[in-house]
From Swiss-Prot:
The keyword Cell cycle does not apply. Catalyzes the oxidative demethylation of N-methyl-L-tryptophan. One of its GO terms (molecular function) is N-methyl-L-amino-acid oxidase activity. NCBIfam families: PRK11259.1 (NF008425). GO terms for cellular component: cytosol. Belongs to the MSOX/MTOX family. MTOX subfamily. Binds 1 FAD per subunit. Its cofactor is FAD. Monomer. Its EC number is 1.5.3.-. It comes from Escherichia coli O139:H28 (strain E24377A / ETEC). This is N-methyl-L-tryptophan oxidase. Keywords: FAD, Flavoprotein, Oxidoreductase. The lineage of its organism: Bacteria, Pseudomonadati, Pseudomonadota, Gammaproteobacteria, Enterobacterales.
């Protein structure tokens, strides 16, 4: 059988692409080296932030607004356990923070619902938070967080119900191109398609070694917290910048545990074996202490944590492009630790590519050629 589309990597973007392409009527094969959702990539750990007024640059705002529409649609398939939780997101940092300036600019340009608070206003609304006098907060009331593993599980199930073929626990070892399309090699044999999408995450260079992607080991952890920090108490998800420039992110507490991670830093790695489990690097359990001590002093000890990986591009912007000389193969990579919120729209973009549809978005800033 020759498929319309083969998807290599069915984590966040791949799961979405499989669903949207199958829903569009294409004959699709989803593949993954493991059984998604799984612990080997960048989507585990239950939750991911979604922010609309984007501190990483306003070029992302049209994408994230479409992503939100698609997340809302997907959430309707899980109304008892919603995939998107509109908790709001408070962005904290010094008044002269470049990241917060970008958030404010994005909000102004796209007329987003963002409220600016000074230090006293932040602490009056959320007494659990402590910030210096020179800090401000930009509160995105319509943002929140996503259930990442539940989202992937839902997409995969919906795609399967729609007739999508799925080949999991079976790594793709090679990709070949010829006049008839794309062939992938696996332990289960060879499969052919008219087009392919490569969204293999951290280890995309195993298949496409020419891509400028650097895997980085990252950790996040859950700390002891009480009901004051919960969604029920209107405690928001958050990003926070310390005076030294370190960037943190976190979520409202659930089951007396608050999840937090440090966005910058981490350990550069070159193989999956180097992504050692949480606590095998001495700093893992204490990485969030500077933020917790200064901003959330009521949070208790570290309960447990997990390691994941970022697939970093040189400028930490996404890479979305077709292979040079092979315009029937699209790759989506270099998501650099801020990609999950876009998984829905990136999957839709991939499905449009498979249907020969022109994208509704300007993807020029994400082309591979910017590094050449």
């Amino acid at each position: 059988m020759k498929y319309d589309l083969i998807i290599i990597g069915s984590g966040s973007v791949g799961a979405a692409a499989g669903y949207y392409a199958t829903r569009a009527g294409l004959n699709v094969l989803m593949t993954d080296a493991h059984m998604p959702p799984h612990q080997h990539g960048s989507h585990h750990g239950d939750t991911r932030l979604i922010r609309h007024a984007y501190g990483e640059g306003e070029k992302y705002v049209p994408l994230v607004l479409r992503a939100q529409t698609l997340w809302d649609e997907l959430s309707r398939h899980n109304e008892d356990d919603p995939i998107f939780v509109r908790s709001g997101v408070i962005n904290l940092g010094p008044a002269d923070s470049a990241f917060l300036a970008n958030v404010a600019h994005s909000a102004e340009q796209w007329q987003l619902n963002v409220e600016k608070l000074d230090a006293q206003g932040i602490m009056a609304r959320w007494p659990e938070i402590r910030v210096p006098d020179n800090y401000i907060g930009l509160f995105e009331t319509d943002s929140g967080f996503l259930r990442s593993e539940l989202a992937i599980k839902t997409w995969i199930q919906l795609a399967k119900e729609a007739g999508c073929a799925q080949l999991f626990n079976c790594p793709v070892t090679a990709i070949r191109h010829d006049d008839d399309g794309v062939t992938i090699e696996t332990a289960d044999g060879e499969y052919q398609a008219k087009k392919a999408i490569v969204c293999a995450g951290t280890w995309v260079k195993d298949l496409l070694p020419e891509l400028p992607v650097q895997p980085v080991r990252k950790v996040f952890a859950w700390y002891q917290a009480d009901g004051r920090y919960s969604v029920k108490n209107k405690f928001p998800a958050f990003t926070g910048e310390l005076p030294n420039g370190d960037q943190y992110y976190g979520f409202p507490a659930e089951n007396d545990a608050l999840k937090i991670g440090k966005h910058n830093g981490g350990q550069v790695i070159h193989s999956a074996d180097e992504r050692v489990p949480f606590a095998e690097v001495v700093s893992d359990g204490s990485e969030a202490f500077p933020f917790l001590r200064n901003v959330l002093p009521g949070i208790g000890c570290c309960l447990y944590g997990a390691a994941c990986t970022y697939d970093n591009s040189p400028d930490e912007d996404f890479i979305i492009d077709t292979l040079p000389d092979h315009d029937n193969t699209l790759f989506i990579t270099g998501l650099s630790g801020h990609g999950f919120k876009f998984a829905s729209v990136l999957g839709e973009i991939a499905a449009d590519f498979a249907q020969d549809k022109k994208s509704d978005f300007d993807l020029t800033p994400f082309r591979l050629s910017r590094f050449q």
